[in-house]
Amino acid sequence: MSNANNSAMNHITLPPISSFDNLIKAAERQYNGEASSASTHPTLPNMNISNGSGSAGASSSMLSYQLLPHSNDVSRSNSSSSFLPSVQQPTEGSASASETSSSASPSRSISPILKVAGPSSVGGAGVSTPHSTKINKPRKKKQCPICRNFYANLTTHKATHLTPEDRPHKCPICHRGFARNNDLLRHKKRHWKDEILSQSGVLSNHNDGKGGSVSPNDDDTHEKMTPMNSVTDYAQLKSLHQIKGTFKCPFNSTLIQLDMDMYPYKLKPLNFETSNCHQTGVFSRCDTFKNHLKALHFEYPPGTKKKDRNVVPGRCKHCGLKFENVDVWLNEHVGKQCGYKYH
């Protein structure tokens, strides 16, 4: 019995160490995905054992066969998790590997397709985002049925197509109609322009008379031109001062005098100097009113350019107080500490 065992042990031979090295290297290549043809061949390459014994070759082939399923599972899992770009551009080796993996596990082959198809359907060309819709949204303008032009305020524009008698804003003096309130204000200022200038001329002649004497003719003329003389003049004066949305210059001598004539209780000495800065002293726009004050009623240093007016110091022309800049003077001084307050 012992002789039989000894003879069996004499017939069993192990493969050389170099063959195990080749086996380990082949398994590493299979695990790293470097051997693309490993899934198509049942045995690993270069596994011939050079000792000439059949048992050693059989044992080495069995070892390689035992390692192959594990390496195939690893490569299959790697391909399903990290080879998503290969779905768009497959190679020959990857195509064969994907076919084998799809036949082995259908769920693994479907899940990468679903992952790729999801983002493409969301970010497709047919889907529009709210941001792009907001950018491409046109401005809301309505077309005029008469002139076929587009306007933001179509109701106001339609009034321009009406006759002057049918327009909504009418002048109380000549009964002419206007489409906008600002147009009516400018029209009223034209009615007052000649009358105010004539009043100023008569008053200046009255004050500058030679020898301090006034002729009866001049006195009669002055009485005729007094704003409070007739009901018509008073109505015109009242309509000019009571127009809503207007801006009145607090330093205009003509406008201040007209306001005092309308409201006698306000007749008192002023603590500032007035000036004949404007024909009427009434403005329909706030920006025009502020530009008028900055240009004519604030004194800048000599040689100051127009672009530097907001940053240089100066003083009020009517009371002499100094300020850091014209904006501080306009916001804190005009109409509060200096200037006439209208009714």
From Swiss-Prot:
Lineage of the organism: Eukaryota, Fungi, Dikarya, Ascomycota, Saccharomycotina
Primary localisation category: nucleus
Keywords, comma-separated and alphabetical: Metal-binding, Nucleus, Phosphoprotein, Zinc, Zinc-finger
Membrane-crossing residue ranges in chain numbering: none
Protein name: Zinc finger protein STP3
PANTHER family in the record: FI01119P, ZINC FINGER PROTEIN
One GO CC annotation: nucleus
Phosphoserine found at: 71, 111
MF terms in GO: sequence-specific DNA binding; zinc ion binding
Location of the region described as Disordered in the Swiss-Prot/TrEMBL record: 31-56, 71-140, 198-222
Sequence ranges of Low complexity compositional bias: 46-56, 71-86, 94-120
Extent of Polar residues compositional bias: 33-45
UniProt source species: Saccharomyces cerevisiae (strain ATCC 204508 / S288c)
SUPFAM superfamilies: beta-beta-alpha zinc fingers
Zinc finger region(s), C2H2-type: 169-191
Protein's cellular compartments: Nucleus
A UniProt-annotated Pfam family: zf-C2H2_4
